[in-house]
Amino acid sequence: MASHAAAKAPSRRRVHTRNRLLAAAYEVFAAEGFGRATVEKVCERAGFTRGAFYSNFTSLDELFLAMWEQRSAELLTDVRAALDEISVDGVTDVRAAVDGLLRAVPLDDAWFRITAEFTAHALRTPALRRVMAAREEAIVAALMPTVVAALARAGRTVADPVALGQALVAVHDGTAAQVLMEPDNAAVHRRRAELFCHVVLAYSTPNGG
């Protein structure tokens, strides 16, 4: 038993180290920007050596992608939980479902800044751009079955889940900056919710319709 536990200990330590580095990187990226971040700054914030960093990640790019996957998994969990809790019954309740979902998954100012900077960095790096595009497609593909199921409970059918997913991402990305710039502006929040509703209704049809 003791030897079995000892064999597992390094794996647990590695997971702990990796999570500490991810948390430290989030703080460094948010405070200084991705472009100004360095491996040394991340290690200093985490309390680890460069060796600990390079035993887990090959670069800051790889670290960011791991962070993105981690936060995407958390987002998927939150969205699924929110949609499962929302009772929808017909078209008139789609807005209520959207409002509930937006409340359950609020925007993160720091994360928006981090992803905006990294996206600009990726656009200058073709290989990285392809990786980001593929991972975003995977995230949307993982999310859409939950969205489609929620709409089915509302009596609506989605003919093209991929198109709906891309449209929802576009609305999210396009309105996030407005909401974060004017967090207390009720009209901005209302328009964001209305745009989500318009997209959902445009890319779905009533059952039997």
Language-model segments: residues:
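Basic, helix-initiating cap at the start of DNA-binding domains
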Residues: 1-32, 36-48, 62
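Amphipathic, non-transmembrane alpha-helical scaffold segments
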Residues: 14, 68, 72, 129-140, ...
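Short hydrophobic/aromatic patch on the recognition helix
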Residues: 46-57
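Hydrophobic alpha-helical connector segments
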Residues: 66, 79-111, 158-168
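Amphipathic alpha-helical packing segments from all-alpha helical-bundle domains
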Residues: 76, 107-116, 126-152, 194
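Helix-loop "lid/cap" segments that line or gate small-molecule binding pockets
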Residues: 99-106, 113-124, 200
